[in-house]
């Protein structure tokens, strides 16, 4: 199928320039947005993993990303948060190139580029610094690439290498252990090609041995550098927290409920929107072929529809989550249609692996699809985009037979109708991604034109936010310098690990973001911290929520009071208050967002 004229630029653009433009686009979004939580959480991990690894024990479920980040911090630590953001853009661009090379033989090149553009634009709204998800994406793409190469070329070593990458992915992000299930692609491909089961078994055995060997080797490295016991303690902690019915982020029942709820919503949104698009295509044909006045009606309807969708995005009826659901749902629906078709076995195998990642990758995350679903789209969505953009004809027939009568109806869409629908749907998807990237910087919901002020920290050079946010941070940095210095223990409570990072202080409770702890674990860590360090730390405490829909505009007033969130935090806050009272802490300074508390004397 020839590309429509509006595809011509993407179709003709030099491939190297295409990749460079995607890289530059990511870099453009690295200069704005100040996040206290996630970026500081991983940044502190990289600072402390070699010098004080026990202080970041909680992060050890992401051990390999900590090693990579720690090495980067050793050589480029002075580049701070901005440097880590550039590093993530480098890894993402590497992932884009690998996906392109993997899928190019089986997809229309223009459609593949469009799929990669949409995922890249959608990603720019999320956490920007290098962290475990960016590294995990690279590893699962390499896993699939080598596994697929092994299937095509019957190379035993490729299966082994693929298994090693699963091992590396697992120690980058523990939930990625589920990627061992990609072995299903070996049996699917073998079944479709009528390969002897004994041969399939040998292929899968090399894959499993590669995984086991990779895990064993990295555990040995952990042992050699003194990280093994800390890693085991981190795993025990995750299991312990998963058993908490009320507060645990990793409880099995909670993860299953999230899984079912998120993917059912994704399929629902995708089905409704795709059905609507079919009806639009039918309408286009009706008004295009009739009297001339119908064409005017069609033109008016087209622009009214675009304005209506834009309005829904502005008033947040269509939001970032709904867009994620749509991309996920369309990928799964395309996966089902491709697997049920008589298409190329290789493409079906790739889509099977892409859908497996799309379903399995978010499962072990504390918030499931909502937080990490975006990182699972890299294989499935470009294939889905190619599938839907290649559709030439679609029809839906209804035939109701009753004893005295028969009702028949048929919706048919083909040719020029689909071209218009595909064109505007793609434009709206890209437009929505750009809109949310522009108006909703990660946990810094402010007008970008107002985000031109920096914070007085060398680790935040090149990162700009609003004047108000910069001011409250500068006040805190200036005043806290009277009480802390690099290398001191500090408890930044409860969701502001960035402060540990920019002051190079050591997390007191073996986790720079105590909000991740449930109440019982936090209480135990407070008591254990004093026994371990014999130090009562300076405490920096935030006064209100600093992330999510209600908190991301700080220090501006919260748009609404998140009563459920504050109620859930109350038991942990109570433990904090008991600790402060027991040890006679006093408030020595505060502004509208933060307060500094100190013990009476150092013990």
Which ranges hold each PLM region?
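Short acidic/glycine- and proline-prone juxtamembrane loop motifs at membrane-interface regions
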Residues: 128-137
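Short periplasmic/luminal acceptor-recognition loop of GT-C membrane glycosyltransferases, typified by
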Residues: 432-517, 536-550, 592-598
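Membrane-interface transmembrane helices that cradle and orient dolichyl/undecaprenyl
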Residues: 105-107, 143-159, 195, 336-345
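Transmembrane-helix motifs of polytopic, lipid-linked glycan transferases
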Residues: 86-106, 142, 281-286
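Perimembrane helix-loop-helix junctions
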Residues: 2, 152, 179-216, 220, ...
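Transmembrane-helix signature of polytopic, membrane-embedded enzymes
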Residues: 99-121, 157
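Membrane-interface alpha helices of multi-pass inner-membrane proteins
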Residues: 123-124, 146, 158-185, 209, ...
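Extracytoplasmic catalytic/substrate-binding loops of multi-pass membrane glycan-assembly enzymes
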Residues: 28-46, 56-72, 78-82, 225-227, ...
